[in-house]
Amino acid sequence: AKLTPNNLETQIAVLTAKYQVETTNSTQATENSSNDKNKSAILSEYEKLWLNNAELPNDAQLWTTWYSQGGRTPEKIYQKAEMLFGKSDVKGLEILAKELEKIENAKEDEQVAAHLALYQDLLKNPANLKIQAEKLPLIDANTNKITNKFAVVLSFARYLRTIPENMNEPTFTPYEQWAKTWQLNETELRDWKIAF
């Protein structure tokens, strides 16, 4: 369900207020473990909103708490990036890439930063897919998934539009190799062939 900004604003305000109540309560009762559960529940509620929206209004307090508790992992950054990329949301990716500027001395992981820049570039310049697709894919050691696969898969149709139509007998062969390298499944490959 797509949320209207006004609705989002209300949701953030409610979550922030709930979190403040829990924080106030926890100073009074230090032994209260249900309190921690409530706080985590509020933060995971916030995380869902963060993952599914390019930008959240007035979320500074929740974001900072969520971030300081290790909520913003590379895996979640890629999950959000994939959602934004699928919507061709360059602005959303820019916001995501600059998020850590809110925290003093916080630095984005270099590889993550490079990938976020790559996604923005592929949305702005789909012709650059060729350079990316001909590289060997990086496999994430933790998840065993190809890190930038979604960007390659989703950029293909846009890339094709950048190729001049007067090319001599275009053939799908070079793209077969890309599909192999990036381990496309049958559905993804079929989508590519349809786009071609």
Predicted segments with their positions:
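Alpha-helical solenoid repeat scaffolds
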Residues: 1-196
